[in-house]
């Protein structure tokens, strides 16, 4: 079979011929139909993500859409290493598969997986969002952020505040369900005032943070003094991505003086059962609502040239 192979952590994967996997007991061999390229997969392939392995070669890809020998079409997660999803065939535990409805396209299902986990897993599994609560999405102009807006609306959020730097992209978020926007390009003091207004005056119960770095620091600083004297819902700050940096400066006094609860959502903070439940809920909702996501299908044979491509659409490799 042919597969994308990470042969070192400094170069993009290469399209190579390699022996197909053989399933163990309890596993299923899948013919892969589609596998999406995410920042998570890029990070694992270059060794920078916390879940990266240390041994090469391996095939990248944590999830995708495949077909079993019996014809069942499924979405799958967690292929057995070193067999990832970016290959003609892969192997996964049967327990790590979700049947897909016939009306969901292969490439769309694959593209929804990573941002879907980031969003559904965060809102349901970690933040436990309740209908009527307000959500602030930090970094809402990316693929996952746009999904988060739509999902928060679907789950009954009363208000959805979206942040980002690209003014044109911010202006388009209202069509997805954002009720307010905050520009991250404004001066720091103005940004703090905007966040204080959102947290203290308007009221926010859940923050989804796709960025970390300076904007996350500003949100947390704005929350200082916003305690819980009247028993109002606390601010559940869910950290999901770190595009703007891996570290921030956090005052101990901020945590003591506020109702902020810091949470993380990702591989390790969510159980396999919680991940599968979140994704099953997502695909059920997709059959009803059709969440907007822009995709760019690419033949897997073009993996090396597409790997470092910068574009707004989600690249989906088709073996």
Residue spans for each PLM region:
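C-terminal hydrophobic helical "lid"/dimerization subdomain
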Residues: 227, 272-319
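Mid-domain Rossmann-like dinucleotide-binding core that forms the NAD(H)/NADP(H) cofactor-binding site
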Residues: 112-186
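Glycine-rich beta-strand-centered segment in the early N-terminal region that forms part
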Residues: 19-37, 48-84, 96
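Local beta-strand N-terminus motif with an aromatic residue
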Residues: 87, 132, 178, 203-204, ...
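NAD(P)H dinucleotide-binding glycine-rich loop of Rossmann-like/cofactor-binding domains
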Residues: 62-63, 74-139
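Short, glycine/polar-rich helix-capping loops at beta-to-alpha or helix-loop-helix junctions
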Residues: 85-86, 164-174, 247-252
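Adenosine-nucleotide cofactor-binding segment
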Residues: 153-226, 280
């Amino acid at each position: 079979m042919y597969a994308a192979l990470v042969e070192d952590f400094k170069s993009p994967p290469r399209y190579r011929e390699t022996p197909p996997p053989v399933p163990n007991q309890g596993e299923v061999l899948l013919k892969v139909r589609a596998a999406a390229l995410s920042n998570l997969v890029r990070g694992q392939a270059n060794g920078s993500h916390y879940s990266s392995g240390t041994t090469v070669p391996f095939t990248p890809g944590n999830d995708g859409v495949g077909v079993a020998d019996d014809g069942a079409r499924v979405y799958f997660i967690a292929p057995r290493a070193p067999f990832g999803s970016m290959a003609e065939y892969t192997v996964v535990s049967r327990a790590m598969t979700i049947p897909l409805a016939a009306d969901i396209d292969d490439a769309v299902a694959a593209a929804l997986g990573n941002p879907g986990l980031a969003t559904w897993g965060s809102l349901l599994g970690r933040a436990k969002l309740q209908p009527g609560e307000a959500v602030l999405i930090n970094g809402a102009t990316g693929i996952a952020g746009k999904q988060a807006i739509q999902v928060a609306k679907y789950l009954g959020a009363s208000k959805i505040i979206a942040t980002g730097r690209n003014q044109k992209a911010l202006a388009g978020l209202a069509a997805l369900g954002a009720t307010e926007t905050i520009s991250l390009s404004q001066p720091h003091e103005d940004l703090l005032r905007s966040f204080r207004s959102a947290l203290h005056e308007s009221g926010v119960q859940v923050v989804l943070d796709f960025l970390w770095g300076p904007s996350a620091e500003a949100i947390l600083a704005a929350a200082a003094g916003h305690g819980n004297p009247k028993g109002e819902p606390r601010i559940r700050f869910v950290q999901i991505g770190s595009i703007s940096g891996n570290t921030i400066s956090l005052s101990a006094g901020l945590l003591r003086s506020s109702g902020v609860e810091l949470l993380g959502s990702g591989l390790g903070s969510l159980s396999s059962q919680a991940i599968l439940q979140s994704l099953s809920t997502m695909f059920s909702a997709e059959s009803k609502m059709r969440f907007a996501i822009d995709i760019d299908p690419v033949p897997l044979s073009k993996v090396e040239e597409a790997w470092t491509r910068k574009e707004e659409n989600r690249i989906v490799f088709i073996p």
